[in-house]
Structure formats: structure tokens, C-alpha cells
Amino acid sequence: MGKLFGTDGVRGVANLELTPELAFQLGRAGSYVLARHEASKRPRILVGKDTRISGDMLEAALIAGICSTGADVLTVGILPTPAVAFLTQRYQASCGVVISASHNPLEDNGIKFFGPSGYKLPDELEEEIEELVLAGTQELQRPQGEDVGRVYLVAEARNNYLDYLISCYSQDQNLAGITVVVDCANGAAYSTGPELWSRLGAQVIAINNYPNGVNINERCGSTYTEGLRRAVVEHKADMGIAYDGDADRCIVVDERGNELDGDHIIMICALDMNSRGELNPPLVAATVMSNIGLDIALRRENIQVASCKVGDRYVLEKMKESGALLGGEQSGHIIFLEHATTGDGLLTSLKVAEVLRRSGLTLSELARGLEKQPQLLVNLRMENKDKILAHPLVQEALKQAEERLGEWGKLVVRPSGTEPVVRIMAQGPEQYLLEEVIAEIKQSIERAQA
């Protein structure tokens, strides 16, 4: 796989790139590095996963690796990624590990580490773990007898997480009378998602909540909202929510069946927080992929947008750097820093419902303030991404595209950190212009690859 850690942990095709052998080595190296940094002879590492069929295989190997160094494991089973982050802090674990590839296809899986405070592991520690794995972990300690690590099932973990989410919701905004359609993506929120809404009094219609190990993200969830949009209209629901495979993001659907992405969610929540004096400073963090319309809508209310690279770790960095309490991505990764250390789809959807209930408006009315500029996003699969993008033909095409889009447009070219894909996004006043510049860029890439 080359470099192991990408922007979101270690990912690859399960049993081919992300093998049980690699999971075992990550368990050994991770527990050793963390034990050394916290000077603990017996670290406790919390482990969760999503619903992929390969999760059991990788979990068994990972846990074996951890226990082989003398560290103990707290297993929480199938839970959302943000639940693992929260529970790591809640149980004072040395670190948390989640086995998931989020919104990626079934064949993929991933292993991601969280530090004891619930934040993603710092780059330096990931590098230490990676170096140790690549060098080989055969020489690391192998305790015997009672010093071998134990595995503990944390049966109450799920309820601890749900209780915390409910504590983040304004108790005077009961959801009785609200109808919500919840698309669980046959993923990690298949159980916690519907129960959360039921406990708050909403009428819940759950879809894609019967995972079988192979149907995660299959024509459902936050990247495929067609079924959810139909269900919202059919049931005359007040809102629809689509989580992804590990429920660290969500997309919302209004009562008319229109999809509201992360830009809409940021605007709705930022305006509400600002009106109540809770957005201090009056600032949000958003990635370069956000629509220019978000900037315009927020600046009307004197709220600034701090821009950053794509990836929730970069959103978090920008939030810490700027003091922003709210930040996120168009894809639906939203961070409420007063409540969570990472993007949490369940928490985000609750916060939108809170605004819906408090305002007395419909979701379509709340979203009306965001007038999006036309946008075109294409994903191009290619190997040697950096080499191709640096080619003079491609560089010249990108330069000409930026000139054509002008000051009211935006061009973003971003190699994916987890897939052999380059994402090209163009925004501007006219759709035909976007189609032309994207076509010219694609043509230059094809010529560079020839």
C-alpha cells in the first residue's frame, strides 16, 4: 500500500491491501507506541466497527495484536465512528480504534485511531506506528501468562453514547409531532439512529436499517438520497436524514424532498447560533469545496468563513486555530466543537431538528437564505495523481480555467487521500461555462496520460 496512513487512517481493499496480517501489526505497533507515550504498562484500547462483512475478520486480528503486547481491549461492537471517539474519552482509554471505511464501497475497510481525548491521533504518533509496522513488530515484547491482554465487552457503551447525544439537545424542544425519515445506510447507525429519534418523541420511519454485512452504502445513505427523498414526500415527513456507513456525516432532506447538503446545514445552524449569541466569534470553518453562496449568505449577517483544505481533520485544525465553534464540509461532515471532537452525523441531525422546532419554520424555509452558485463536480480515476497533475499541459489548462471563471468563480482540484481519484470542482455564474472548463481540463489530463 506504500504509505499506510492517509488523511483518514489506514484504508484499502479488505483482505487484499488491508489484510488481517496488517491489522495484527497495527494492533501491536499501536498499543506499543501508546504505552510508551503514556508510560503505562497495561494500556486500555477501545475498539468499534461498522457493519462490513470484513469487520469481524479485521477486528479479530487487530485485537489479537493489541493483546499480544499486554494491552487490554474494550470492545463496543457496531457503533458510529463518533461514538468511538466519545467513548474513548468517556472510559479514559489510552486510545480508540474504529474499523470502518465510512462512505466507501463494501470491498474497502479502514483502521483509524483516536487519542485519549477523542481527537484523531496526531500525525507524529501515526508516523511512529507506521514506521514500526514497516520495520516489523517481531521484536516487540510478548508477555506470557497473566500479562497477556484481556478483552472486555462494554455492554452499556451504546446507551452511554445515546444518553450523551440527548443531553446535547435542548430539552424544551421535544420532537413530538415531528415526522422524521431516517436512512441508516445499512451501516453503523442502523440501531442508534432510529432509537435516538424515538427517544426524543419524533415519529420515526427508518429505512435501510437491516445490515447484512454486504449492503452498507448500497444505493442508500448520504451519497445516494433518491430513496430518502421519495420516502419523505410519500410519508409527508417534516425532514429526512441520511447517514453514511459510519455515521460521521449526514445529509438532510426538506419536507418537499429537496436535498440539503453540508453548506445548508452550516448556514442553518450558524444563523441560529448567531441569533442566540452562541456563535462567538461570529465565524465558521468551511473547506475550499464549499459553495460561494455560503459565504454570501453568512456575510449578510456579519459571519465570516475561514477556509481550509478538504478533510475533517483540516476543518478541525482551522476551528482550533481561528476559535470557530462550528465548521464542516459540503459532504455533511459537521463539527460542533462544544459537543464533539469529530464530525457526528447523529449530533448534526439533532442540531438541525432543534432549529426546525425552535424556529417554527419548515426546512425549506430555513434553507432559503442560501442561493447556490452553479457547481460541477467530477471524479476522475487515475494512478500517479501527483505526476499527472504536475504535467505542463494540465497546469496550463488549470490556469486558463481559473482565468475564465474569474473572481465570481472557484476551481478546486483535489487528489483524494483515500482513493485513486482526483476530484475537480468548478463554480461560476453559468453552467455552460463550468462544463466547458471541466471538459478542457479532462482533455488535458487524457493527453498527459497518453
Swiss-Prot record:
Q: Name one GO biological process term.
A: UDP-N-acetylglucosamine biosynthetic process
Instruction: Give the catalytic activity.
Output: alpha-D-glucosamine 1-phosphate = D-glucosamine 6-phosphate
Quick one: a GO cellular component term? cytosol
Q: Which cofactors must be present for this protein to function?
A: Mg(2+)
Q: PTM details? A: Activated by phosphorylation.
InterPro entries xrefs: A-D-PHexomutase_a/b/a-I, A-D-PHexomutase_a/b/a-I/II/III, A-D-PHexomutase_a/b/a-II, A-D-PHexomutase_a/b/a-III, A-D-PHexomutase_C, A-D-PHexomutase_C_sf, A-D-PHexomutase_CS, Alpha-D-phosphohexomutase_SF
Q: Which residues carry this modification: Phosphoserine?
A: S102
Family that this chain belongs to: Belongs to the phosphohexose mutase family.
> What is the name of this protein?
Phosphoglucosamine mutase
Name the source organism: Syntrophomonas wolfei subsp. wolfei (strain DSM 2245B / Goettingen)
